[in-house]
Curated annotation (Swiss-Prot):
Quaternary structure note: Monomer.
Function per UniProt: Mechanosensitive cation channel with low conductance and high activation threshold. In contrast to TMEM63B, does not show phospholipid scramblase activity. Acts as a regulator of lysosomal morphology by mediating lysosomal mechanosensitivity. Important for the baby's first breath and respiration throughout life. Upon lung inflation conducts cation currents in alveolar type 1 and 2 cells triggering lamellar body exocytosis and surfactant secretion into airspace. Also acts as an osmosensitive cation channel preferentially activated by hypotonic stress.
The entry's keywords: Calcium, Cell membrane, Disease variant, Endosome, Glycoprotein, Ion channel, Ion transport, Leukodystrophy, Lysosome, Membrane, Phosphoprotein, Transmembrane, Transmembrane helix, Transport
Organism per entry: Homo sapiens
GO molecular function annotations of the record: calcium-activated cation channel activity; mechanosensitive monoatomic ion channel activity; nucleic acid binding; osmolarity-sensing monoatomic cation channel activity
Effect of residue 462 to N: In HLD19; loss of mechanosensitive ion channel activity
Protein name (record): Mechanosensitive cation channel TMEM63A
Length: 807
């Protein structure tokens, strides 16, 4: 049968492309990571250096475990800082309550020597749920699904793919040759190459199946208050609470408004309240010390004043109680003054709480869903006599986030200022990572200065494999910290949005740093763009076949080994946090300040960064599980150790976080990128080794294209589903559900304050105990008591949704 003209043209173009890339029948293995001649770094060694790297990494892991055990037992309760943190920081899930606190202490004492090690295996999900919240349970459930997936992948890769690769005879017969275990060992005319593509498709379906099972297990207990509260942006800054309430009453007469809260800028007030709280704790500390010892303590409150050995001008000592009393009075004056100016700083935001969830859903649908009439689609909400005054057509309406998810101090940063700040931070971040994205640039620089020439004859695997993979892990560990702090500077309105953006950015940068650029043999994004766009560059024809060099897979196997042992060991030790902790303890001016540092050292678990880092390694494992099946069991070891370390850290180290479920679904979507990249790798192999017209290449291309189209369709429908009214399920009001529903009426609405301000509110207002226990959005209830009869409930940092900021 004659070939079609389309395939003839396709084949000619493919041959032309392969000729431009300088590809022959076999890959050119004279270069991979460095194009410099006679490079002494990253050259092939016995079995890719894997045995040596494994031995060194396991030894380092045991050493890190020993160091952590000593530090945890001897210094500052460092290994369980979440348990010694102040109770106010943990009130979100009633941590350190009378029951759970005593239970925790019994648990610690019961385990005896090295309790943290056995606690990893003895902890139950119920304990983690009570102590750490729902998000920790979903995160650990995600890891367990990844573990089961990698068990299946490891079994198939070792029992099917590895024997197939070993059956080839293209490379040396040396049993110590790592290349014999890779797909590069098979001849191009070997029909067994079809098996690799079929198993890549199987891995894709397995990943989809396991991830779907995980998403079905994600069950969030929606807060009644959250689901019946709407967050509104785009309000005129001079809008009044009564006007907004009248608008909803007139436009939606069937929807009963419980409360309307306007949002004001309280960022400075929150900061002052935090400082006042620290000062009060220090004052209490020295007051109790005086009662106990009968003597007043002298301190030197100047920076590094504790290191002054004598009293000189500018370094005088003073009474601790007098100093902190004076600081407290000064802060109270500033808080009182700031409260008086709060209402002069409106944010143009509000949140409205309704009697029923169905009412909030109905209004959200009216504002967001496109309603088509004839040939026109419009989204104008129902009008009222106040619509023009309130500019309702410019409103952005979303469901409100949980109050614990709000970054209260960031609400004042919005509109053009927010976008300019975001662009500036990310442009600077991109420039910084543009020229330094993989440690290969350091290795090539070492070659230029002949640093490694003396060991050229040794061909030592410690130099050629251990240090490069250690450098790669070090850079991949540093990058999340850089992206983390840059994301904090972006001033997101919710912690969920902050974590989701962080996860996306870290994952993309890590995939480029760890997988794509090293696979292509590129040293940085600078070279990547030059290779991509500069057709006259000498590097433009020498990169793609680097993906399938025999020793290429060994580099990634060693990286996964380093991540499994050194990475998880360092994550348990948390060396950057330990250094910061030590620095803060040294710089604390007084013993009371050091006590405050110790109690405020615990932070919330950054699910976004941790998801991204774990998914990066998972993507490397799956992407090379076909071309280099040896990587799969080491990947399983990595995720098992990661799971145990995270169980320990979530329970003993980090404070619980209250996030939206969107971040867990985003992690599932990113996990699906792993088998897609595996298909990409097989397609590149088929294209470079077999040609475009080969049946295996065409089949892989069609599967890959279909997968990408399905993912794009899913993403697009997910992005635009709010335009369809069918996606807003309206529940029946309680009055239509009978007496059974009436028994579950929502509790009465009572204003609520941000956590840091709640203590002041309870101290200075006459709120009843029942009122203090109920949660709502945004209010500051006459904290200072300086404005008699006036409630500053409107001067609130309102609840926000995890939506992008509007100008």
């Amino acid at each position: 049968m004659m070939d079609s003209p389309f395939l003839e043209l396709w084949q000619s173009k493919a041959v032309s492309i392969r000729e431009q890339l300088g590809l022959g029948d076999r890959p050119n293995d004279s270069y991979c990571y460095n194009s410099a001649k006679n490079s002494t770094v990253l050259q092939g060694v016995t079995f890719g250096g894997i045995p040596t790297v494994l031995l060194i990494d396991v030894s380092c892991f045991l050493f890190l475990i020993l160091v952590f055990s000593i530090i945890r037992r001897r210094f500052w309760d460092y290994g369980r800082i979440a348990l010694v943190s102040e109770a106010d920081s943990e009130s979100r899930f009633q941590r350190l309550s009378s029951t759970s606190s005593s239970g925790q202490q019994d648990f610690e004492n019961e385990l005896g020597c090295c309790p943290w090690l056995t606690a990893i295996f003895r902890l139950h999900d119920d304990q983690i749920l009570e102590w750490c919240g729902e998000d920790a349970i979903h995160y650990l459930s995600f890891q367990r699904h990844i573990i089961f997936l990698l068990v299946v992948v490891s079994f198939l890769s070792l029992c099917v793919i590895l024997p197939v690769n070993l059956s080839g005879d293209l490379l040396d017969k040396d049993p110590y040759s790592f290349g014999r275990t890779t797909i590069a060992n098979l001849q191009t005319d070997n029909d067994l190459l079809w098996l690799h593509t079929i198993f890549a498709v199987i891995y894709l379906f397995l990943t989809v199946g396991f991830m779907r099972h995980h998403t079905q297990s994600i069950k969030y207990k929606e807060e009644n208050l959250v689901r019946r509260t709407l967050f509104i942006t785009g309000l005129p800054r001079d809008a009044r609470k009564e006007t907004v309430e009248s608008h909803f009453r007139d436009a939606y007469p069937t929807c009963e408004v419980v409360d309307v809260q306007l949002c004001y800028n309280v960022a400075k007030l929150i900061y002052l309240c935090k400082e006042k709280k620290k000062t009060e704790k220090s004052l209490t500390y020295y007051t109790n010390l005086q009662v106990k010892t009968g003597q007043r303590t002298l301190i030197n409150p100047k920076p590094c004043g504790q290191f002054c050995c004598c009293e000189v001008l500018g370094c005088e000592w003073e009474d601790a109680i007098s100093y902190y009393t004076r600081m407290k009075d000064r802060l109270l004056e500033r808080i009182t003054e700031e409260e008086r100016h709060v209402q002069d700083q409106p944010l143009g935001m509000a949140f409205v709480t309704f009697q029923e969830k169905s009412m909030a859903t109905y209004i959200l649908k009216d504002f967001n869903a496109c309603k088509c009439q004839s040939l026109q689609c419009k989204g104008e909400p129902q009008p009222s006599s106040h619509s023009r005054e309130l500019y309702t057509s410019k409103w952005t309406v979303t469901f409100a986030a949980d109050p614990e998810d709000i970054c209260w101090k960031n609400l004042s940063i919005q509109g053009l200022r927010w976008w300019l700040q975001w662009l500036g931070i990310n442009f600077t971040l991109f420039l910084g990572l543009f020229f330094l994205t993989t440690p290969s640039i350091i290795l090539s620089t070492m070659d230029k200065f002949n640093v490694t020439k003396p060991i050229h004859a040794l061909n030592n695997p410690i130099i050629s494999q251990f240090f490069p993979t250690l450098l790669l892990w070090s850079f991949s560990a540093l990058l999340p910290s850089i992206v983390y702090y840059s994301t904090l500077l972006e001033s997101h309105w919710t912690k969920s949005g902050e974590n989701q953006i962080m996860m996306t950015k870290v994952y993309i940068f890590l995939i480029f740093m760890v997988l794509i650029l090293p696979s292509l043999g590129l040293t940085s994004l600078d070279f990547f763009f030059r290779w991509l766009f500069d057709k006259t560059s000498s590097e433009a024809s020498i990169r793609l076949e680097c993906v399938f060099l025999p020793d290429q897979g060994a580099f990634f196997v060693n990286y996964v080994i380093a991540s499994a042992f050194i990475g998880n060991g360092m994550e348990l030790l948390r060396l950057p946090g330990l250094i910061l902790y030590t620095f803060r303890m040294i710089m604390a001016k007084t013993a009371a300040d050091r006590r405050n540092v110790k109690q405020n050292q615990a932070f919330q678990y950054e699910f976004g960064a941790m998801y991204a880092w774990m998914l990066c390694v998972f993507t490397v494992i799956v992407a090379y599980s076909i071309t280099c099946p040896i990587i799969a069991p080491f990947g399983l070891i990595y995720i098992l150790l990661k799971h145990m370390v995270d169980r320990h850290n979530l329970y003993f180290v980090y404070l619980p976080a209250k996030l939206e479920k969107g971040i867990h679904f985003a992690a599932v979507n990113q996990a699906l990128a792993a088998p897609i990249l595996c298909l990409f790798w097989l397609y590149f192999f088929s294209f470079l080794r077999l040609g475009m017209k080969a049946p295996a290449t065409l089949f892989t291309f069609l599967v890959l294209l279909l997968t990408i189209l399905v993912c794009l369709a899913h993403t697009c429908f997910g992005c635009f589903k709010h335009l369809s009214p069918l996606n807003y399920k309206t529940e029946e009001p309680a009055s239509d559900k009978g007496s059974e529903a009436e028994a579950h009426m929502p509790p009465p609405f009572t204003p609520y304050v941000p956590r840091i301000l709640n203590g002041l509110a309870s101290e200075r207002t006459a709120l009843s105990p029942q009122q203090q226990q109920q949660q709502t959005y945004g209010a500051i209830h006459n904290i200072s008591g300086t404005i008699p009869g006036q409630c500053l409930a409107q001067s609130a940092t309102g609840s926000v949704a995890a939506a992008p900021q509007e100008a």
